């Protein structure tokens, strides 16, 4: 099977490409990139569009198994495709927890028919309880590529340390949710002016910062790598920046909502703006953007966390989390590229190249022989987020009703069109 993409501006920083050219796809892989290519296969005229390597979202909650009323593997990957996400890392806070070979295999088997490539993160500890370590060899053999207790920190530092020493030998990535639960103390939103005004218990920024400091200290002491999730505070950015200067093997991600929204959104009393870590202050947002631009923060990942409208109905009692895969590119393009803080090529590094490198997966490139995971985007098209037109089961997006710039027009997975706008 052949497919020829004509006249696209190919933006692939891993391949040092940023030019108008053609892409020939054969049998699911990139066969040729150049001008004047001809083919008897399907022709896509991409004049006016950019072609980028499929986005890699390294932080996704698919809710499958156990919470499939919120999302499942098939619907989650449908949402991924609509957002240009062709590879994703599924978090282990499922029910049962992804802490056994059986659950890893269940996810991978179900994902074979999905519209995105699904990679699995198993838990560091059984049931995310920090009471007993997961059998890392067993989950690795079943196909897991990463380890995390995301949704909560690994409270037992010895178990985290042991996992950090073992994971590199198996080619696995340790992904750390940084939070001091004693400091967080059941808070619901960022501690500060807004929480005081609403009379809602806050989570101090220090809860995240203490967790970040612990993980960096471990990585430094062990001389082993660690990846830090969903960075939301200016102090965590400073800690990571300093650690990188000292040669600590730390990488980090933030999420689209942390570069675009502040805790003032919570004044609406809408739980779709509640996530963990919570939305912070404008000073935090500014420093998150600085961290992305100067390389302190390596990646953008959504922390896609679906919940039903019923679950999100009560502002204080609602679970944390928001969906994000369908809006991720548009939000980052709007708030980072269109504001002049970074180029489209630099954004592709954060959304494709670096996540693939951190996870050690075959993605983030359009080089000859690579998987033909290609996204056609119009970086200048404006659109308004309509929750009724989203592709997943849940609608809890903090960007509902917002007009964004940058639209995914087609998503190609292994040479097959899985989404078309």
What are these regions (language model features)?
Residues 109-124:
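A glycine-rich helix N-cap at a beta->alpha junction
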Residues 197-225, 272, 294, 298-300, ...:
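His/Asp/Glu-enriched, well-ordered alpha-helical/loop segment
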Residues 8, 23, 28, 48, ...:
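Divalent metal-coordination and catalytic microenvironments
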Residues 36-51:
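Active-site metal-binding motif and surrounding structural segment of the metallo-beta-lactamase
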């Amino acid at each position: 099977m052949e497919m020829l993409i004509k006249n696209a501006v190919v933006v692939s920083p891993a391949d040092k490409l940023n030019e108008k050219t053609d892409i020939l796809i054969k049998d699911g892989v990139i066969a040729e990139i150049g001008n004047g290519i001809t083919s008897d296969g399907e022709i896509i005229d991409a004049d006016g569009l950019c072609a980028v390597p499929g986005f890699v979202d390294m932080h996704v909650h698919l809710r499958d198994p156990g919470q499939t009323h919120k999302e499942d593997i098939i619907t989650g990957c449908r949402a991924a495709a609509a957002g240009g996400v062709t590879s994703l890392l599924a978090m282990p806070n499922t029910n049962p927890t992804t802490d056994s070979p059986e659950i890893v295999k269940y996810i991978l088997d179900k994902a074979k028919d999905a519209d995105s490539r699904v990679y699995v993160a198993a838990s560091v500890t059984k049931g995310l309880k920090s009471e007993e370590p997961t059998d890392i060899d067993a989950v690795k053999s079943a196909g897991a590529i990463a380890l995390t207790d995301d949704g909560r920190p690994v409270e037992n530092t010895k178990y985290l340390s042991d996992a950090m020493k073992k994971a590199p030998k198996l080619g696995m990535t340790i992904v750390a949710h940084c939070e001091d639960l004693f400091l967080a103390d059941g808070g619901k939103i960022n501690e500060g002016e807004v929480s005081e005004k609403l009379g809602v218990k806050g989570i101090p920024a220090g809860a995240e910062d203490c967790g970040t400091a612990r993980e960096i200290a471990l990585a430094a002491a062990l001389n082993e790598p660690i990846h830090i999730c969903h960075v939301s505070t200016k102090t965590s950015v400073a800690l990571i920046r300093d650690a990188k200067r000292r040669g600590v093997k730390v990488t980090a991600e933030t999420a689209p909502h942390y570069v675009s929204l502040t805790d003032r959104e919570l004044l609406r009393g809408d739980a779709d703006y509640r996530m963990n870590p919570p939305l912070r202050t404008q000073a935090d947002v500014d420093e998150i953007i600085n961290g992305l631009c100067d390389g302190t923060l390596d990646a953008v990942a959504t922390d896609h966390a679906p919940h039903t409208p019923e679950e999100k109905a009560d502002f204080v009692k609602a679970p944390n989390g928001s969906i994000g895969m369908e809006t991720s590119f548009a939000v980052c393009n709007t708030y980072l590229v269109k504001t002049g803080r970074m180029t489209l090529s630099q954004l592709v590094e954060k959304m494709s190249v670096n996540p693939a490198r951190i996870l050690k997966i075959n993605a983030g490139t359009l080089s000859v022989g690579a998987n033909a995971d290609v996204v056609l985007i119009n970086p200048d098209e404006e659109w308004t987020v309509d929750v009724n037109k989203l592709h997943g089961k849940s609608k809890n997006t903090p960007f509902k009703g917002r007009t964004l710039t940058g639209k995914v027009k087609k998503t190609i997975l292994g040479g097959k069109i899985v989404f078309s706008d």
